[in-house]
């Protein structure tokens, strides 16, 4: 550390010497230039920070600000300060060089071709708070030129200048730090001046006034040559003037040099004081150089323009915001310095020529004044007005240095306290605003005051001081001078008080009383009385509230909705709140023009030009705030401009705003140097290092290229705004009760920032910040060059000055106050920041949005105050040692001082330091208390969370007591518990908003905090018990506690709600079950009572007939008791449920249940005994009749089940599987069959019916044969329904029924039939049902299928069957949806499917039928396709069935066939000559008196004159004479109809279904879970169905319309289906699609298996070849090859181990393979659906080959009549006609009696073999692909195998 300090000292000394040499050379050059430069060429002042707008390009060293300067340099154009400029000034401006090219588009021109227009300043100008030269005192005559406004002379005493009115007034209304009057430290951070301070102000003001008067008087007569001498004399006189016994104060300096005497920077034309003046100033006492507190007084404009009409600039009062109102030592407070060694007081002892790089300057000239010969002055520039002092000066320097540090800390404390207070209030008000939903209006009302000061308009603007008020105040100030001693302090105080008093009076005249009422009690503590010209006493001036108090008052007024509203401002609706207003898009006011008192001429207002008395004064336009007013013309009319976004032409106004606000912030709390590497993401480091300075925040943003987060930018801007709100609140707002100025300034500042960011940021924040860094880096280089130049000048100074300067620097380093040159970067230099921002503004930028989330950001800043307070406390502690050492050193020096004045001065300094230190500690304590009170809200939240958690736990315990105990099952107790739950839930609902609100607040709080470990209270408090917890630790502990409590409360609350819901559900369930239980008990009791009555009526049978009758009665009683037994079992189950769930069933219910169980057992025993008696009587009667027992004669007795093994005779044997599925063994042939021998014979007989041409009649004939053989035609539907209900099958349609239960039900049905073989009928019926619905013989079918299969074949009316079938699938509302309807149709279509006839009826896909039914019911196609929840009623279903749909047309045909069996028609068949016709009678409706019998029509026989195209009418009953006459009439009409008519109007006898290429099939119930494994291969019927269905679809795909005939015209359609076949059937050809499929199945199986084997062998060969190729490729890499071999061997070993010992792995592998095969088969099915249509078309063409010629001839020779078989769709009669004409025979294949297989003939089937081979090969290829992908690990092998397989398939197909 010592080495580093020594090196830095040596480096600094070397730089110091170089700087001194450069400075001396530079001073000589400047003096020579000043002697020869004319004053007429001066270009005025300029604003430092603009890129050399008025600087001559020829200057070699354009320095805008000194290095290490920590305040913003403010250089004001003299044209702005002196509105009465003459023509010579304008000519001087014209003669000056113009701005550089980059500023041409930025600065608006005022008509001068070569000069840039100076920029108007905003209200934060510190120089505009004092009178200007034009504002002369009343007694001093002023020499004004004719160009000055007439109002200056006419106003008399004191006139507000035109240029300064907006800026001055805005400064007064926006800066509370300008000059604060009144207030105590307890209420505000701004203190009153004590007597000593007022005395100093009085002296300063008096000297200033004298100097101004002298300059004004001499300006009119003095010429440019002697003005320099005049000013030097005036300055010297000013310094040496008597001040009531006190030393004359020096000319105040605006800047405070850090380590050298202050040398105000002058331009080359500025005259230097003569050498005598320099010596006198150097010899002046130290007391003359400093104020009472050791600070140098601020210096104003000490330069002036050389024009003849110009006047000396004013010397404004310095602003002292941090003075102490309680000290009586007469000191003036001063601003803090950002650096520990940057104070002007630290370097007063330096020699006159000494200078360091931290020197700061205030004013500079830009125009170079040269003489005619161009020579430069030789006068040397004085370095200071002070002379060297004795050793006491060093002590005072040390004291002032420490005081400077204490003052810095005090400023930080005040800043933090105000900021925390403001932001905490904002946070609290935001929460209140969200809950209140009050109409808020934050718009600032505007006012339009006329020139006469009339108050007729109520739209008063409280934040704007009108010129009238200032004039009145100045008048009262001049009047009051005669009544009291006029000192500068008193004058200034009276001036400000008059302004505030006038504003308050004018404000109170326009504002409502309720707005003034909340702040009317605030009074100032001072007792100063102000006397005006009109009144003897002034009203008391109210106390100065702090910004936080103002904001609190404002938000209180907002909450009370008492903000004054103007007439022309927009109103806010009831839905608008504070958040909605804050979050709205920001808009900036448009750029307006004009000056106070001046008129806007023409279009100059839009372009920025301002006309004053017809002339342009050169003042540029400036951006008006939203609340500002624009006086226009002399009559006082005001003009309000529209608001709009800031345009590129007004960016310099925005930059001006930023610069002025930066000056105010810098003046209040100069920023500390923050390293450029500071993290921009840390709000803590930002606030701790940079305070609230806008300069620091801009430095932090621009110094880090990674701070690209919009959130961070928003945070920085909002934080700056909060600092502005807490520090820069205007003084007028602090002394008036108005709250509008605060919110107006707040919004204006924020709008300025965001408008600039939104408008001028380019591609992104990264590019923007990068450009900022580059601009600052370039400026840093300029500053370094300036430092080197200064160091060079310092080297040229005398050696004793260098030595003294080095000693002073060494003392600073030893005391810890030396500043590192590297610590001051360009990023902290205000001028460089200003210049960087302005350079960036020159470039076009795209919009870069910054989130407008102000209030939320303020809450985030409030949350960081704990961390800031900790940093502040640590900073105070670090200065405690310095303070103690300084205090001790000062006390020791008091005894060694010889001069009494020095001792008094040192004593006063020590007292002041002690007092400030105590104030600092008290403020720190106050801040800590305030921050602790800020955490009270979160502590209250934590307490509330804990209380709610305890409440939830209590309620949970209460719920456990209520809901977990035993539940009484009676209705009264259950209802009482339901009421208790309702009351309990009401308590929860009442508490729900509070719980959710606390949970939401807690989650929001912990969301903004870093995640910490949720330890317990014991762990968290373990370390904190033994030591003091800092604020950060307390905050961390608070966060941890809130996080833990939020989680606990959330969990407990959710559990409580869930348990409450479960309790409610349980109570509802118990109530429902208990009511059902009691209802069933009552029903069961009545049933048992009725059965007992029947039991008492039993009598012994007296005869056999009576015994049979009693047996039937007993059976009916058993059926009833079966239902009662089911009810009793249900009751017992419910009682067990209640017992398991701790539900106390009422005692009467339990007693009744036990009694019913006993009575039911007794009844069962009695019925068994009764059955034995009746059976004995029945057996005796059977034995007497001599019957063998195989047939019964109307016995009606149920009895035990017969032995079904007797249903077959030897050599057949009946056996059953484990699932009770019967199968039959033929011992003679040693074969087994699923079908009964009688069933085989039956199916063989059905094959003979395949000769019938028409599918509907063929199917009906087959079903009629089955129906008769199974004796189902003798069982009525009502008997079947009763049997279903008797055996508990009601409402059990979705359940499964096994074979024993089916046998029981069938037995109950067959016992009602007389003279049948009961065992044979039962076995055949079971066989038929299993064939239809359980072809896989799983032993179980659905109850719905069992019922449908029996009802379809039993005896009953057709409509009754339809109604019953619909009732089976209907819901409780008697409606059926798509799914239920599909299940019903699926079970119905299985009957023709078993017979091989399903293809003619639309196939097994029932989706088209369901669609047809829904469309017939009036449901739209969109609803059907959208799978909406649609359903139909019974009448819709019946209406659809009356049209005889294609899928169910065989059922009505079956009923007509059964009705026509016994019908005899008195007519003769014209073909076979049968008479009478038995069965169906068919009459031709075109041929007169032409009848056909049933046999001739079915087999398609034809006559000479009759053709199949003729319409026919079918009769199933005997005709009447009326029908004969009607048929004759129809035949006569058809005689006159042509063939075209019948072709145009084809008619079918059923409702066709569009089944070709329909959508996916609806849900079809699988018979069992085992059906899907090998269903397509094992189930022959399924395969026949698939191929035949597609065949029929392709065959009849292009037929005609869907018209439906009337029932009366049915006979007319019969003739359409009559067409004789041209030849006999060829026995060698396939007779039907069934036979075709069977032939293909048998013949191609072996061939396909051979192909599969070949493909597998080829696959193995390809794999071997692939392995060889891989080994060859890897031969060059032995290591890899060995690794692969090793891996392969390892895997082989593992697989071997798995095959040997791991059975589970093998089983899993098999399951995966099985799953893959299933998925492959599903893919095969999908491929079949896509390809079968084309394949079956080829099949049809091949099938047409045997009789292709005959069919063609027949088709061409027949007319196309209605319903023609050649052009119509498949229908009831004609479908098989077309098929028969093409296939010759269309009957199912015959079955071999021996093995049950279908017989087939392989001749003439080569074409079929080829077609099916292609189809099967595709399936095999898919299987092989799946097998290869699952078993082969190499992808290339699989691909090669697949390609080879496809190639082989192609070859086979060829």
From Swiss-Prot:
Zn(2+) 2 binds at residues 1484, 1487, 1506, 1510. Spectrin repeats lie at residues 936-1069, 1072-1176. Keywords: Actin-binding, Calcium, Cell membrane, Cytoplasm, Cytoskeleton, Membrane, Metal-binding, Phosphoprotein, Repeat, Zinc, Zinc-finger. Residues 143-157, 331-345, 518-536, 716-727, 815-830, 1682-1694, 1765-1796 have a biased composition (Polar residues). Residues 11-37, 84-96, 276-296, 728-740, 783-814, 1827-1845 have a biased composition (Low complexity). GO terms for biological process: actin cytoskeleton organization; establishment of cell polarity; imaginal disc-derived wing vein morphogenesis; imaginal disc-derived wing vein specification; maintenance of presynaptic active zone structure; muscle cell cellular homeostasis; muscle cell development; muscle organ development. Residues 595-606 have a biased composition (Gly residues). Gene3D superfamilies: 1.20.58.60, 2.20.70.10, 3.30.60.90, EF-hand. The modification Phosphoserine is found at residue 1564. Residues 1206-1239 form the WW domain. Residues 1-65, 84-161, 240-352, 516-548, 595-650, 716-740, 783-830, 1012-1036, 1179-1209, 1673-1701, 1744-1854 are annotated as: Disordered. The keyword Cell membrane applies. During embryogenesis and in third instar larvae, expression is seen in pericardial cells of the dorsal vessel and in the ventral nerve cord. Expression is absent from both the embryonic and larval musculature. The keyword Protease does not apply. A zinc finger (ZZ-type) spans 1464-1520. GO terms for cellular component: cell cortex; cell junction; cell projection; cortical actin cytoskeleton; cytoplasm; cytoskeleton; dystrophin-associated glycoprotein complex; neuromuscular junction. Residues 1815-1826 have a biased composition (Acidic residues). Disruption phenotype: Flies that have reduced expression of all isoforms (due to transgenic RNA interference targeting the common C-terminal region) exhibit severe muscle degeneration in larvae and adult flies. Muscles were either ruptured, absent, or the fibers were detached from their attachment sites at tendon cells. These are necrotic, not apoptotic processes. It is found in: Cell membrane, Sarcolemma; Cytoplasm, Cytoskeleton. Pfam families: EF-hand_2, EF-hand_3, ZZ. It is a peripheral membrane protein. GO terms for molecular function: actin filament binding; structural constituent of muscle; WW domain binding; zinc ion binding. Component of the dystrophin associated protein complex (DAPC). Interacts with Dg, via the Dg WW domain binding sites. Required for the maintenance of appropriate synaptic retrograde communication and the stabilization of muscle cell architecture or physiology. May play a role in anchoring the cytoskeleton to the plasma membrane. This is Dystrophin, isoform D. It comes from Drosophila melanogaster (Fruit fly). The lineage of its organism: Eukaryota, Metazoa, Ecdysozoa, Arthropoda, Hexapoda.
